[in-house]
Structures are given as C-alpha cells and as structure tokens.
C-alpha cells in the first residue's frame, strides 16, 4: 500500500481491479476541509485516461510492473506477436491490450512489454518512431494559408499533420506521446 501523498508521475497503482499509471498529481489544501490529492491516471489495459480525487489520508495498492525489451514480429488476426530480445520467448498481445499503440507498431520495432503478475498486459512505446508517408497531398510552393501543414497518412494508418515539403515516400519521426510530427528522418 502506498499513501496518495507519495504519488509521482510513472507510479503504477491498482484501483478497482485495474492497473493505472499516474500521469499527473496535485496536492490541494482546502481552507476549511481536509487536503486532497487530484490525479490523472491512465488505464494500462484500455488506454483510457481518468481523473480521480483522493483524500490525503488514503492508501492504495501499488502495482509492480516488470518491463522486458521485445521486438514486434507480426500481426495475425487481432493478435500481435512479440519476441523477447534476451530469452527469445514469444508474447502474444491482443488489439484491446495494445489500444492506440497499434498506430505506431511496425515490424522490427523494439518496445517494452509490460508484465503484471507474470502476464503481459500491454506495451510501452519508445518516445519517437520512424514511419513512412504513404498518402498526402502535394504541397504547393508559397501556400501557407493553411498554416504550413497538411494531413499525411503513415504506413501504419496513423494520420498526422506534417509540413508542406513532406512527400509520399518520405520517412518522418513521430512523437508517440502526442501523435505529432517531429522531423524528417
């Protein structure tokens, strides 16, 4: 059990039978009442983000998550196959377990597979990934009325805003936290 006063970003907790990671926390001191802790939590199984308020004297169970480096191999049906980089053991995760992470998965990418009580429950992506542009409008010279960006569909199906000079076939670096273009690869 861990006190809600000891929360920090990245801490994993168990709440109502689900595993959450703390994204943000804030101590709130009331003038006439008990202090509270407001937190922003992300469900590791579904990817949903919730906000919750705890009384400052509450305790919650801490979830101990193990991480193993693994390479993404392939997709078969709604199952995604990974191989451990050290033990060469294969892990199978479903589309539901991966959530939005599937938009960044490309065969050969290395990710961290998250384990809770010995079972794989999800993955942690690297901060950036390199993906190829497969569909985008041609950028016209001097056309900056639209803010200097245009939509581009990447090889995984993800659509992001890219600068006008990006063409089909270009490889771009994408920030996986915000689904944003970083630079040309």
From Swiss-Prot:
InterPro entries: Elong-fact-P_C, NA-bd_OB-fold, Rib_uL2_dom2, Transl_elong_fac_P/YeiP, Transl_elong_KOW-like, Transl_elong_P/YeiP_cen, Transl_elong_P/YeiP_CS, Transl_elongation_fac_P. One of its GO terms (biological process) is peptide biosynthetic process. Pfam families: EFP, EFP_N, Elong-fact-P_C. GO terms for molecular function: translation elongation factor activity. Keywords: Cytoplasm, Elongation factor, Protein biosynthesis. GO terms for cellular component: cytoplasm. Its main location: cytoplasm. Pathway: Protein biosynthesis; polypeptide chain elongation. It is found in: Cytoplasm. NCBIfam families: efp (TIGR00038), PRK00529.1 (NF001810). Involved in peptide bond synthesis. Stimulates efficient translation and peptide-bond synthesis on native or reconstituted 70S ribosomes in vitro. Probably functions indirectly by altering the affinity of the ribosome for aminoacyl-tRNA, thus increasing their reactivity as acceptors for peptidyl transferase. Belongs to the elongation factor P family. This is Elongation factor P. It comes from Dictyoglomus turgidum (strain DSM 6724 / Z-1310). The lineage of its organism: Bacteria, Pseudomonadati, Dictyoglomota, Dictyoglomia, Dictyoglomales.
């Amino acid at each position: 059990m861990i006190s809600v006063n000891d929360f920090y970003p990245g801490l994993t907790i168990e709440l109502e039978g689900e595993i959450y990671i703390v994204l943000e926390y804030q101590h709130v001191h009331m003038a006439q009442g008990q202090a509270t802790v407001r937190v922003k939590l992300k469900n590791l199984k579904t990817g949903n983000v919730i906000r919750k308020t705890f009384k400052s004297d509450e305790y919650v169970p801490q979830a101990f998550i193990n991480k193993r480096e693994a390479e993404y191999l392939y997709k078969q049906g709604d199952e995604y196959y990974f191989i451990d980089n050290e033990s060469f053991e294969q892990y199978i995760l479903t589309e539901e377990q991966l959530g939005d992470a599937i938009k960044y998965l490309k065969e050969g990418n290395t990710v961290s597979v998250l384990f809770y009580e010995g079972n794989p429950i999800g993955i942690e992506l690297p901060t950036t990934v390199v993906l190829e542009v497969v569909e985008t409008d041609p950028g016209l010279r001097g056309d900056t009325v639209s803010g200097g960006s245009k939509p581009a569909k990447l090889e995984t199906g993800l659509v992001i805003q890219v600068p006008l000079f990006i063409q089909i076939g270009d490889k771009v670096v994408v920030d996986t936290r915000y689904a944003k273009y970083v630079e040309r690869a």
